[in-house]
């Protein structure tokens, strides 16, 4: 499972909120485009 898949899974299942997903971009786990794909909002 890639980091993108992990973050998406955690967010989709309510384990992570948007702040945690945003921090994943800061830590280079996912890109800003992937953030937008996961959450549906602009980074």
Regions found by a protein language model. Give the residues of each.
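Viral virion structural and adsorption modules
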Residues: 1-43
